[in-house]
């Protein structure tokens, strides 16, 4: 994994716009229903770049829909009031917030850069920010996560009134720090019975 101290946002924006221009004609005549900025942490891109691409999308795919849905995935660590407002201003209508867990211990095991309190506060800010919809991501099957840990996450997130939850079972990716920690016994994944109970608790 290559880590840069600064995200090359301008170069990436130019590349996305160039590819959009090159491919748009292949979809001419189709009605655009939604656009999704996902696949990692697009909130690191910045509202200016996202806004330029949204403008490009509207230019390439003119839509008569007033309710065109444009979703952005965001890490709670980036979800300040100013950042949320900036994305709303450039046309993002729906926010998907990657909470993953509200347990500090679980978040540390996942190498996340926010705490449970940070995540909950970010969700509450997002719900106040004026998006047409907000979604939160949660993971179960986490290392050393009990059924009680999982139901606590579900209960606390549901209590915010968030209209949509995306729930996933953890996938341990190859050649990651998490895989190494599981392989050498430093972390233990829940048994199949515990994971099944977590699924049933949903």
Language-model segments: residues:
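C-terminal scaffold of the Radical SAM
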Residues: 2-26, 30-202
């Amino acid at each position: 994994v290559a880590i840069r101290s600064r995200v090359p946002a301008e170069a990436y924006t130019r590349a996305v716009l160039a590819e959009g221009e090159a491919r748009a004609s292949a979809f001419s005549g189709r009605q655009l229903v939604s656009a999704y900025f996902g696949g990692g942490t697009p909130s690191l891109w910045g509202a200016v770049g996202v806004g330029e691409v949204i403008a490009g999308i509207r230019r390439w795919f003119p839509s008569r829909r007033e309710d065109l849905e444009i979703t952005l995935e965001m890490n709670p660590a980036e979800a300040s009031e100013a950042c949320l407002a900036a994305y709303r201003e450039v046309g993002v209508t729906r926010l998907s917030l990657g909470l993953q867990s509200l347990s500090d211990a679980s978040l540390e095991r996942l190498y996340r850069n926010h705490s449970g309190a940070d995540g909950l506060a970010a969700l509450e800010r997002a719900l106040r920010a004026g998006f047409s919809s907000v979604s939160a991501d949660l993971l179960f099957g986490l290392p050393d996560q009990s059924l009680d840990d999982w139901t606590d996450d579900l209960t606390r997130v549901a209590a915010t009134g968030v209209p949509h939850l995306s729930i996933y079972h953890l996938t341990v990716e190859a050649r990651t720090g998490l895989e190494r920690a599981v392989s050498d016994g430093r972390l233990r994944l829940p048994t199949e019975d515990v994971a099944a109970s977590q699924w049933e608790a949903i």
